[in-house]
Amino acid sequence: MQINEGIHLAYCTNIHRGEGWRETFDGLKNYTLKVRDNVSEGKPFAIGLRLGNSAAIELSEDGSGKIEEFIKWLDENNCYVFTINGFPYGQFHGARVKEQVYRPDWTSNKRLEYTKLLFDILSKILPSGISGSVSTLPGSFKEFISNEEEQGAQIIDNLGVCGDYVKQLRESTGKDMHLGLEPEPLGWFENTIETINFFGRFRSVHGDKYNSIIGVNYDTCHLAIEYENANESLLLLKENDIRISKLHLSSALKLKPDEAAVNYLKKFEEDVYLHQVIARYKNGELVRFRDLPDAIQKFNSNQMVDAVEWRVHFHIPLHSSPSEAFSDTNDHIREALEVLSLAPTLCAHLEMETYTWEVLPKSMQTNDVVDQLSHEYKWTLDELQSVGLISS
């Protein structure tokens, strides 16, 4: 939905299953329209569309009429798409994803072709007068990079090819479309300084011709896990002329690692998603763990006595307090929205992203996924109003 003259808000449909186009479309019909009815008050309803590679290929198949059918459906149901989540290429629910969410990475032509296809689709379904974004992974996963020079060069080359492709689409359609690279714990670049350094390297090859085309998808969960301050991070990115393509509004688990909290945290261990942990020690040192079981094992071996805080990459509902043992990182979301309220042209795209519905502990689930999403909208709209981005 359009929340003011230039800013749009959606929820990301990666919360629903949808590997092929038919399953994806069914999710929009069965869930998204119900959320629309609960929150939109008759206004045009924005969709943050997740399209995996299989779904994108099916939707765009020549002669199938599927994309025309989808455009008609959007119009008939007072909906529109302004952003596509292009991070997960393959299966994202019901099976082990973990680090495989980074495959193929930007060293691969498969990732390039998939992302180009998403922009093809976006160029056709994006309404005139609205900018469009695609979000993607931060190049690769750190442990996949065995040759920094060679693989880094390949990532930068492929992103340049993608930038050229988007530039041509922008010129042929007259639509402002852009790619947002999404820093994430243990991604090839994961925090603000690493992101700035990446763009420095990228621009040393390509110059500044992609500045408006390739930017950052700033995920408030991810940067909070890195113990960053949203005000400082966003202003640093702006000072370095890095476009904020999209703001992901998402929240992480935060806890003081005592025995009771860590025991309760075991409820969040599951086999689908990667739950990176960053522990902060008394001396300010940050120590990273690949997944939640790694951090718990370290704690149980009495090797973390000086750790004063853990932040866990587990997206939790924005409106729901996780438990008495834990806190959340909603303060980072509030900081980001306060920055946006002072500089509304900083970013036009807001997207709530809590894809973990199926693996949440039962105590954190509401009646159903539609109910959860409706509550998240209410929380977010209240926060937007509190900082003046929505008039009362």
Residue ranges of each PLM-predicted region?
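Active-site acidic/histidine proton-transfer and metal-coordination neighborhood
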Residues: 95-215, 225
